[in-house]
Amino acid sequence: MSRFSQKDRSQPGAAAAQVQAVEAAYVALMRAQRWLVGMLVACAIIGLKLHGPPGVLGNRIYLPAILATSLLTLAFTLRGRLVLPSLDELRANPRDAMLLRRWSRNTLIVQWLCTAVGLTGFALQLLGAATSLALTLYAIAFAYLFMLRPVRP
């Protein structure tokens, strides 16, 4: 008998408490995602009201698109290299608090990178870029926040 199963027999509530900790972390990550989506909606509305003068960016519209593409590439890379391996480890050992923190932190980083794409659209609105370009970046940010949402361990 392993020492973990002996610990479960000596402390029957410990395993249930760890499952609750994992569930609480998942709920907190989903709450953070909803907050980020709400922030992007608020930025879109504020950006429509405070639209900057046209022509500030000139022909440099491609630079924010390159930045947004780089951020999404980084988000996908981090998800594959950090989030998914820590998720697999967490599923194998849900009682490890370090794994839970690592999974939560890495998932938050990926969510913030996706949100940064939408904030790029907000910056474009303030600099006077076309509204369609900014709204496209918001839509991409919403789509990637949905696609890269936290996975329940």
List each model region and its residues:
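Alpha-helical transmembrane segments
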Residues: G58-T73
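Cytosolic-side membrane-entry/anchor segment at the start of a transmembrane helix
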Residues: M1-A42, P153
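Hydrophobic alpha-helical transmembrane segments and immediately flanking/interface helices
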Residues: Q125-R152
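Short membrane-interface loop/juxtamembrane segments of multi-pass integral membrane proteins
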Residues: L90-L113
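Alpha-helical transmembrane segments and their membrane-interface junctions
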Residues: I45, W112-A134
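Membrane-water interface of transmembrane alpha-helices
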Residues: S2, L74-R91
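Short, hydrophobic transmembrane alpha-helix segments
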Residues: G47-G58
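Core segments of transmembrane alpha-helices
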Residues: V37-V41, A68-T69, L113-L119
